[in-house]
Each structure stands twice: as C-alpha cells, then as structure tokens.
C-alpha cells in the first residue's frame, strides 16, 4: 500500500463468512442402559445425552432423555407394572426475528445465509474502534454483532408415566389387564435484548 495515497476500499472478502459459520461442528451422543430381574420382578432403564454444534456460530442443540420400567409379581396371579420416561431439549433460535414481534417465529433466516454468502468484499464488518459493526439490521446485518444482542432459546420438556396390572383369572386362559398413563409437556421460549448501538 502506498502511504501517500488514501485507501478508499479494503478487501474484507471471507471475513463475514468466517465470523458466521463454523468450519467443523462437534457432536456427542452417549447412551447408557441397565436391565435385570428374577422370577419375581424385572426392570430396565436407560439414559441418553446428545449435543450437536450448529452450522452457525453460537447455535447448538442439546437433549437429555431417559426411561425406566419395572414389573413385580405381588401374588401368583397378580403382576403390577409401572414406568416413566422424560425428555429435555434446548436450542437457541437465531437473532433474525422481527424486533417488533419477537414471538412470531423466524422471519429472516434466509437473509442471514443470503447476505452472508453474497456480501461484497469491500463491506467492512468492523467499526473504527475494532468492535463489530451492526450492519443494516438484525436480519441482514453483521451476525457477529447481533448474536450477543438478541438472544432467544427454546426449551422442551416431555414426561410420561404409566402404571398397570395383569390379573390371571383362569390359569393360562383368561386375564384381566388394566393400564393408565399420564403425559405432560412443557414448552418455554426465552427472549432477551441487550443495548443496541448502530
């Protein structure tokens, strides 16, 4: 660069892409199972954990799930069984939602990919002081700036329980079975907005 000339444009090609997307994503998947029993009763249980990094930096998905089931022969003709299962998952949503209606779902995900991949190389993603520049808006601006200013996460929790019995009325011929179950689900959306300077 000639120090006697004014620099009008600078090449920032690829910077926005590198600030937005991961080159590699890490995934974990763990599973544990236990089971056993005797002539009186049986049981089985499992526990799982799954974690996956998103393609976009600062996004990921996590899930924990488990089950437990058991049966026990109270009398020679009566067996009871019970069990339960649960699932918990959490993932952050992108910051590209409508600022006036943050609960209405995603409205600008395609802008994030389109703008990031097609941004002209002379666009500077940095302010003069070295901080990330906001760009045009949260939907098509600088993801590196907006990812910490607008945060939203979705959490799901699902739980089920069951209990039942089997009564042998006539040996090997007639049985009376009864079962009942309960299912509970909880959905939570968290949204926060930090100070924005543009």
Regions found by a protein language model. Name each.
Residues 19-21:
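C-terminal beta-signal and adjacent terminal beta-strands/loops
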Residues 9, 30-32:
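N-terminal periplasmic accessory domains that precede
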Residues 27, 38-39, 73-77, 170-172:
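Outer-membrane beta-barrel channels and translocator barrels
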Residues 32-38, 66-72, 161-169:
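Residues on the lipid-exposed face of transmembrane beta-strands in outer-membrane beta-barrel proteins
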Residues 50-52:
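Ligand-site clamp/hinge motif
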Residues 1-13, 24, 54-59, 65, ...:
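Surface-exposed loop/interface segments of Gram-negative outer-membrane beta-barrel transport/assembly proteins
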């Amino acid at each position: 660069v000639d120090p006697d000339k004014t620099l009008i444009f600078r090449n920032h090609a690829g910077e926005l892409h590198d600030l937005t997307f991961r080159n590699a994503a890490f995934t974990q998947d763990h599973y544990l199972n236990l089971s056993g029993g005797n002539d009186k009763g049986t049981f089985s249980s499992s526990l799982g954990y799954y974690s996956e990094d998103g393609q976009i930096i600062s996004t990921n998905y996590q899930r924990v799930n488990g089950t437990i089931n058991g049966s026990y022969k109270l009398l020679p003709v009566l067996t009871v069984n019970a069990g339960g299962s649960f699932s918990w998952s959490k993932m952050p949503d992108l910051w590209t939602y409508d600022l006036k209606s943050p609960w209405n779902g995603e409205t600008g995900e395609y802008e994030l990919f389109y703008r990031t991949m097609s941004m002209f190389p002379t666009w500077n993603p940095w302010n003069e002081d070295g901080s990330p520049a906001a760009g045009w808006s949260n939907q098509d601006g600088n993801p590196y700036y907006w990812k910490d200013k607008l945060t939203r996460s979705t959490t799901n929790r699902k739980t089920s329980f069951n209990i039942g019995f089997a009564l042998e009325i006539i040996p090997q011929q007639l049985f009376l079975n009864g079962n009942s179950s309960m299912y509970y689900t909880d959905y939570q959306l968290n949204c926060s907005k930090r100070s924005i300077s543009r």
